[in-house]
Amino acid sequence: MESSGKMESGAGQQPQPPQPFLPPAACFFATAAAAAAAAAAAAQSAQQQQPQAPPQQAPQLSPVADSQPSGGGHKSAAKQVKRQRSSSPELMRCKRRLNFSGFGYSLPQQQPAAVARRNERERNRVKLVNLGFATLREHVPNGAANKKMSKVETLRSAVEYIRALQQLLDEHDAVSAAFQAGVLSPTISPNYSNDLNSMAGSPVSSYSSDEGSYDPLSPEEQELLDFTNWF
């Protein structure tokens, strides 16, 4: 009876499942390393199958932007650096090489040495011409007082002045030639100079008082007599 009761109680109880086997720590880390290696190999094969994209170029930064320091306290230093870079000869040469024809204007080209020398000679010539006209203006009548005379007026006044001087020289030469030829020689009369002065001072009275003693003067002698009144 007791054995049959034990068999019934044992049949009524369910059998327990076997407990899982727990591996040691070394086996766990080896399994994790193998799984990581398999994942890396799968990722590498996937990258090889995908088309390779072109490498992206790094953005180029201008030297002016790189040289500017950050912060509000360094703004003055940044402005000075930018001003120095803008006035550097290398940057100016780069600006000259730029083509601005598409914008409707162009930068002035640097003149060659021959053109610079020619311009310098032209400036010196104009300066000398102006100095010459200033000197001529001082020698013509009323030229020193009128400093606003134009070049044309200065030349015209100089021509008139030269003609007047030439006329005086011609008349003086004519008088000298007449004296040398004996037409107005002082040996004609011992009191020639006194008579000439008296005729120059009062010709009407001398003619009226001594009409019988003097012959009428020729037109040439009368012209010479008028010339002596200038002195």
UniProtKB/Swiss-Prot annotation:
Keywords on record: Acetylation, Activator, Developmental protein, Differentiation, DNA-binding, Neurogenesis, Nucleus, Transcription, Transcription regulation
Pfam hit, one: HLH
GO cellular component: neuronal cell body; nucleus
Residue spans of biased composition, Low complexity class: 39-51
Tissue specificity statement from the Swiss-Prot or TrEMBL entry: Developing CNS and PNS at embryonic and postnatal stages. Expressed in the epithelium of glandular stomach.
Sequence ranges assigned to domain bHLH in this UniProt record: 113-165
Main location: nucleus
Subunit structure: Efficient DNA binding requires dimerization with another bHLH protein. Forms a heterodimer with TCF3.
Protein purpose: Transcription factor that plays a key role in neuronal differentiation: acts as a pioneer transcription factor, accessing closed chromatin to allow other factors to bind and activate neural pathways. Directly binds the E box motif (5'-CANNTG-3') on promoters and promotes transcription of neuronal genes. The combination of three transcription factors, ASCL1, POU3F2/BRN2 and MYT1L, is sufficient to reprogram fibroblasts and other somatic cells into induced neuronal (iN) cells in vitro.
GO BP term, example: enteric nervous system development
Phenotype on disruption: Lethality at birth caused by severe defects in neurogenesis. While the brain and spinal cord of the mutants appear normal, their olfactory epithelium and sympathetic, parasympathetic and enteric ganglia are severely affected. In the olfactory epithelium, neuronal progenitors die at an early stage, whereas the non-neuronal supporting cells are present. In sympathetic ganglia, the development of neuronal precursors is arrested, preventing the generation of sympathetic neurons, without affecting glial precursor cells.
Gene3D superfamilies according to UniProt: Helix-loop-helix DNA-binding domain (4.10.280.10)
Composition bias, Basic residues: 76-85
Gene Ontology molecular-function annotations: bHLH transcription factor binding; chromatin binding; DNA-binding transcription factor activity; DNA-binding transcription repressor activity, RNA polymerase II-specific; E-box binding; identical protein binding; protein dimerization activity; sequence-specific DNA binding
Coiled-coil annotated spans: none
Record's protein name: Achaete-scute homolog 1
Residue positions, PTM N6-acetyllysine: K151
Subcellular location: Nucleus
Region annotation (Disordered) ranges: 1-24, 39-92
